[in-house]
């Protein structure tokens, strides 16, 4: 009788472990712009506080823009994720770090949204084997508002928490051809 309970327990444990295994499936027909920092992705993302950036969006979003002293960014992730990664603030989910009355991590309600408004940028190439495909940029990590700029063009605005948005960037591929 003891062996039956052990067998059932092991079966149930295996089911729970399987249920908690994250799904890392990546569609081979897509390019994922995950950052090297934090996600071991293939792309170098950088960020800079918007009100400290004097250049216009048309220039910042151009290939080859010199970022100078921009910080590494975690993508997908939030502004706060990247600020914590860069040791600007402590981990909010540790101890009492995020408690309002401690004033360790600035609260948006007190600072205003400009405080957490940053430029995020990376550069990527559309592979040659995408030549006969329509190319979409899928953005699904925005929290809370963003303008999407590519190659000097404003392609869209979005707002909401982490909702996916799909932007056709196919026309830009042929701009410099």
What does each model-identified segment do?
Residues 21-30, 48-52, 86, 91-92, ...:
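Accessory beta-strand-rich segments of carbohydrate-active enzymes
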Residues 9, 38, 63, 128-130, ...:
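Generic structural signal for beta-strand residues in well-ordered domains
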Residues 1-22:
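Bacterial Sec-dependent N-terminal signal peptides
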Residues 8, 13-14, 36, 83-86, ...:
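Low-complexity, intrinsically disordered/propeptide-like segments
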Residues 98-109:
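Short glycine/proline-rich turn/loop motifs
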Residues 19-100:
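Accessory carbohydrate-binding/adhesion or oligomerization-edge regions at the termini
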């Amino acid at each position: 009788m003891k062996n039956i309970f052990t067998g059932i327990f092991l079966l149930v444990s295996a089911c729970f472990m399987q249920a908690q295994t994250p799904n890392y499936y990546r569609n081979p027909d897509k390019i994922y712009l995950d950052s090297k920092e934090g996600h071991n992705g293939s792309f170098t993302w950088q960020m800079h506080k918007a009100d400290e950036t004097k250049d216009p969006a048309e220039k910042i979003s151009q290939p080859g823009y010199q970022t100078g002293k921009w910080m590494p960014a975690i993508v997908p992730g939030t502004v706060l994720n990247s600020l914590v990664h860069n040791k600007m603030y402590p981990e909010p989910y540790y101890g009492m770090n995020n408690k309002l009355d401690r004033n360790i991590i600035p609260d948006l309600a007190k600072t205003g949204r400009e405080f957490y408004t940053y430029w995020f940028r990376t550069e990527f190439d559309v592979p040659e084997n995408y030549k006969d495909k329509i190319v979409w940029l899928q953005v699904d990590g925005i929290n809370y508002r963003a303008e999407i700029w590519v190659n000097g063009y404003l392609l869209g605005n979005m707002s909401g928490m982490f909702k996916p948005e799909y932007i056709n960037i196919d026309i830009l591929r042929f701009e410099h051809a």
